């Protein structure tokens, strides 16, 4: 009872961080292209233009601000830039200003310099600090850009040059020193490329195995095959998306956008028609990636719902629920992805569509979030049932360590199936592309996200006893067939025992029993007649060997499998006709998990 009361509270506590950082999870695989950077820069320019228009339409506010700004003159002393430490001589206006009075100057008007939207500037050499814009991917978003406003209400110029002075050194530090950052990204790319490749290969083999053996065709394995296929399509869509995005100019290339290039881009934007045509392939790739990403989450949820139904439903019709699970896993993600595509194409048809566009991202993120929360709650509840079952089976025994080991093993087996690793760093959103915590988080997520399909294929296919039994049986049949073919190529043989000569082909030396397969002579018992060995392919009428073979009843054939109890899928697709079948179904699930 104590465990039952604690589990809901624990699930609620662990699910709260999931709701608080959904954006970080779903956008983890996005990349920034040069075209997307251009789009963000133009959008920032448009927003700045609106703000400038609002400010310029209120001259009274500027004059009121003008009255409040005063600064003391420091004639005869050079000024030092607070940001860069460079010394600049005083202007002639500052030298002429009286030293025994306070001078009221005009503020510098806000303006767009093709990178930043500068606010009103205080006069008399005051340095204006503005945070580095977050819409420029390569900038250091913790730094600041600096400008200085003179007493005439003009932004200070660079000495000897006819352009406004600005200090972007803190913002562009990632552009000038990116060797270590590139090593981190290259390592992350290698990790998830290897992981998704191994997952794709192992899942392909697993699907072929489950599809080839007819005795493995059952609802449980059909659901496994759908889950495997969703992992495979997710991996393929990621590879395709990366190929499309990286085929053009991206911000992960060696040549990055410099400050001058950003200004040139903002001054001469590309034609909208050309930009839209160039985004077609990218948008299709991103759309399929988001769809297969969503289907993967929902088939993980289907696995949890299926196992949960076997545990808590007394009468569970698997055939009927399989169709519902199929529609749920493939159809529901198609609905909200189609809605998202329609909204993006209608209201925000800009960029490559892998960027968030206001609140429209929640059309996809909320359903994915809901699936993560649900299958984590199912995981907690199933682990609770496992703990209860182990406690009941271990009642009266003193070895509690074995009980805990079984529970730990069962939990570890269920973790990759339910994607429990998703919630480890859910409370840590992507706020910066640097730092030790960010590197730990990215390595963890890239490792487990890419290798999750590989772990699922190993646990639920290659380590499954039923699958191993079918493979061993097929291997035995294949080696037996090779043995007969090898002996058949040796031709007919003559065997002489006393007055009788038997010319027998080796392909007919054994009777067909059991599963209808021919048996090798060395596998059959050798009978004797009058002290002479009796060949399997020849026996005198009335001999014990012949009588034994002739009177062998059909009941000696392989017994019919009875479903989960014997580790087979036969009989799983029948409707539940009595209270005995659900425990049989559940027994196989316990064998897989335990």
Swiss-Prot record:
<feature type="transmembrane region" description="Helical; Name=3">
    <location>
        <begin position="296"/>
        <end position="316"/>
    </location>
</feature>
<dbReference type="GO" id="GO:0007166">
    <property type="term" value="P:cell surface receptor signaling pathway"/>
</dbReference>
<feature type="transmembrane region" description="Helical; Name=2">
    <location>
        <begin position="224"/>
        <end position="244"/>
    </location>
</feature>
<comment type="subunit">
    <text>Homodimer in the absence of bound ligand. Peptide hormone binding leads to dissociation of the homodimer.</text>
</comment>
<feature type="topological domain" description="Cytoplasmic">
    <location>
        <begin position="383"/>
        <end position="405"/>
    </location>
</feature>
<keyword id="KW-0325">Glycoprotein</keyword>
<feature type="transmembrane region" description="Helical; Name=6">
    <location>
        <begin position="406"/>
        <end position="426"/>
    </location>
</feature>
<feature type="transmembrane region" description="Helical; Name=5">
    <location>
        <begin position="362"/>
        <end position="382"/>
    </location>
</feature>
<dbReference type="Pfam" id="PF02793">
    <property type="entry name" value="HRM"/>
</dbReference>
<dbReference type="InterPro" id="IPR002170">
    <property type="entry name" value="GPCR_2_parathyroid_rcpt"/>
</dbReference>
<feature type="glycosylation site" description="N-linked (GlcNAc...) asparagine">
    <location>
        <position position="167"/>
    </location>
</feature>
<dbReference type="GO" id="GO:0007189">
    <property type="term" value="P:adenylate cyclase-activating G protein-coupled receptor signaling pathway"/>
</dbReference>
<feature type="disulfide bond">
    <location>
        <begin position="48"/>
        <end position="117"/>
    </location>
</feature>
<feature type="glycosylation site" description="N-linked (GlcNAc...) asparagine">
    <location>
        <position position="162"/>
    </location>
</feature>
<dbReference type="InterPro" id="IPR036445">
    <property type="entry name" value="GPCR_2_extracell_dom_sf"/>
</dbReference>
<feature type="disulfide bond">
    <location>
        <begin position="132"/>
        <end position="171"/>
    </location>
</feature>
<keyword id="KW-0297">G-protein coupled receptor</keyword>
<protein>
    <recommendedName>
        <fullName>Parathyroid hormone/parathyroid hormone-related peptide receptor</fullName>
    </recommendedName>
</protein>
<keyword id="KW-0675">Receptor</keyword>
<dbReference type="GO" id="GO:0008528">
    <property type="term" value="F:G protein-coupled peptide receptor activity"/>
</dbReference>
<dbReference type="GO" id="GO:0017046">
    <property type="term" value="F:peptide hormone binding"/>
</dbReference>
<dbReference type="GO" id="GO:0042803">
    <property type="term" value="F:protein homodimerization activity"/>
</dbReference>
<dbReference type="InterPro" id="IPR017981">
    <property type="entry name" value="GPCR_2-like_7TM"/>
</dbReference>
<feature type="transmembrane region" description="Helical; Name=1">
    <location>
        <begin position="189"/>
        <end position="209"/>
    </location>
</feature>
<comment type="similarity">
    <text>Belongs to the G-protein coupled receptor 2 family.</text>
</comment>
<feature type="region of interest" description="Disordered">
    <location>
        <begin position="66"/>
        <end position="102"/>
    </location>
</feature>
<dbReference type="InterPro" id="IPR000832">
    <property type="entry name" value="GPCR_2_secretin-like"/>
</dbReference>
<feature type="modified residue" description="Phosphothreonine">
    <location>
        <position position="552"/>
    </location>
</feature>
<feature type="topological domain" description="Cytoplasmic">
    <location>
        <begin position="317"/>
        <end position="319"/>
    </location>
</feature>
<keyword id="KW-1133">Transmembrane helix</keyword>
<feature type="topological domain" description="Cytoplasmic">
    <location>
        <begin position="462"/>
        <end position="594"/>
    </location>
</feature>
<comment type="function">
    <text>G-protein-coupled receptor for parathyroid hormone (PTH) and for parathyroid hormone-related peptide (PTHLH). Ligand binding causes a conformation change that triggers signaling via guanine nucleotide-binding proteins (G proteins) and modulates the activity of downstream effectors, such as adenylate cyclase (cAMP). PTH1R is coupled to G(s) G alpha proteins and mediates activation of adenylate cyclase activity. PTHLH dissociates from PTH1R more rapidly than PTH; as consequence, the cAMP response induced by PTHLH decays faster than the response induced by PTH.</text>
</comment>
<feature type="topological domain" description="Extracellular">
    <location>
        <begin position="245"/>
        <end position="295"/>
    </location>
</feature>
<feature type="transmembrane region" description="Helical; Name=7">
    <location>
        <begin position="441"/>
        <end position="461"/>
    </location>
</feature>
<dbReference type="GO" id="GO:0005886">
    <property type="term" value="C:plasma membrane"/>
</dbReference>
<feature type="region of interest" description="Disordered">
    <location>
        <begin position="525"/>
        <end position="594"/>
    </location>
</feature>
<dbReference type="Pfam" id="PF00002">
    <property type="entry name" value="7tm_2"/>
</dbReference>
<feature type="glycosylation site" description="N-linked (GlcNAc...) asparagine">
    <location>
        <position position="177"/>
    </location>
</feature>
<dbReference type="InterPro" id="IPR050332">
    <property type="entry name" value="GPCR_2"/>
</dbReference>
<keyword id="KW-1015">Disulfide bond</keyword>
<feature type="topological domain" description="Extracellular">
    <location>
        <begin position="341"/>
        <end position="361"/>
    </location>
</feature>
<dbReference type="InterPro" id="IPR001879">
    <property type="entry name" value="GPCR_2_extracellular_dom"/>
</dbReference>
